[in-house]
Amino acid sequence: MNESYRCQAATWVERGSSATMGGVLFSAGLLGNLLALVLLARSGLGSCRPGPLHPPPSVFYVLVCGLTVTHLLGKCLISPMVLAAYAQNRSLKELLPASGNQLCEAFAFLMSFFGLASTLQLLAMALECWLSLGHPFFYQRHITARRGVLVAPVAGAFSLAFCALPFAGFGKFVQYCPGTWCFIQMIHKKRSFSVIGFSVLYSSLMALLVLATVVCNLGAMSNLYAMHRRQRHHPRRCSRDRAQSGSDYRHGSPNPLEELDHFVLLALTTVLFTMCSLPLIYRAYYGAFKLVDRADGDSEDLQALRFLSVISIVDPWIFIIFRTSVFRMLFHKAFTRPLIYRNWCSHSWQTNMESTL
């Protein structure tokens, strides 16, 4: 047996490991995602009769709901196996001895699946934000809530097919220390192309998705800055244009303040996702191209996996904090009102000068 990992064939949980952190993270993730879904429902996502009092859900909130459900499913399917391993002091391979390595492979598949699916959905959210700000006419004609509902199933289908490749012989799943985690094997003594190739392919795809998300957010930020400049230099025209297009906003076009909320929320989530994804990407490339053919960084690999799992825990809490009325009020007072006041003062000064002349 070509063992490249210290705990690859372990049957017991390594000494010195505790389930406390896993239990806390599971509880925080479960509570956070449930509360996030409640807030989404209260914000109008569950309205069945769109109208003046019940506007239809925006595409952005449909995407947020899909991401939250994905996080919740991942947390409910993965974390109980970790806690069960700690409770019985058995590794994942020994929790169901009759199944052989199947439980470990299922755990690794779920880890890779939910990691990729949530990244794809986050990219869709960033793309939606960029299109709504930079290409509003295209957005109005082609981006609808019905199409937004398809994002989560399509992302799930792609992730399902991609992450199932190890079951077809391309790639391999392995148990990591302390025996409570399984994931994609990132090193191999004989430099197997299928093992190393799938690891590099998965991490490269993740890196590409994270990069595309950052690019979309930078584009959205550039559009927001351009809109702010136009509002400063042409306040009358902006007000007139907004009044003329009021019906369009009521029929699904984003409100400026709502877009600002969405963008800040998306920026925070993207920064978090980038920070939590980079360690895994680095470890995959390091394991594939390092000179020594042995696993000398079990703790580093475990930390990278834990960083990846933190995303589904912290994301909903960011959403909960940001969607509270107190935080929104403080945010709008700190950023939106000063800009409006400054534009009003600038416009008043310009009008007085024109009347004087």
Swiss-Prot record:
Receptor for prostaglandin D2 (PGD2). The activity of this receptor is mainly mediated by G(s) proteins that stimulate adenylate cyclase, resulting in an elevation of intracellular cAMP. A mobilization of calcium is also observed, but without formation of inositol 1,4,5-trisphosphate. It comes from Rattus norvegicus (Rat). Strongly expressed in eye and gastrointestinal tract (GIT), moderately in the brain and oviduct and weakly in the epididymis. In the eye, expressed in the epithelium of the iris and ciliary body and in photoreceptor cells of the retina. In the brain, expressed in leptomeninges, choroid plexus and spinal cord (sensory and motor neurons of the dorsal and ventral horns). In the stomach, expressed in the mucous-secreting goblet cells and the columnar epithelium. Expressed in platelets. Residues 42-57, 128-149, 216-261, 328-357 are cytoplasmic. The keyword Transmembrane applies. The lineage of its organism: Eukaryota, Metazoa, Chordata, Craniata, Vertebrata. It is found in: Cell membrane. Keywords: Cell membrane, Disulfide bond, G-protein coupled receptor, Glycoprotein, Membrane, Receptor, Transducer, Transmembrane, Transmembrane helix. Belongs to the G-protein coupled receptor 1 family. Residues 1-20, 79-106, 171-194, 283-306 are extracellular. InterPro entries: GPCR_Rhodpsn (IPR000276), GPCR_Rhodpsn_7TM (IPR017452), Pglndn_D_rcpt (IPR000376), Prostanoid_rcpt (IPR008365). The chain crosses the membrane at residues 21-41, 58-78, 107-127, 150-170, 195-215, 262-282, 307-327. One of its GO terms (biological process) is positive regulation of cytosolic calcium ion concentration. This is Prostaglandin D2 receptor-like. The keyword Membrane applies. Gene3D superfamilies: Rhodopsin 7-helix transmembrane proteins (1.20.1070.10). One of its GO terms (cellular component) is plasma membrane. It is a multi-pass membrane protein. Disulfide bonds join 104-182. GO terms for molecular function: prostaglandin D receptor activity. Glycans are attached at residues 2, 89. Its main location: membrane.
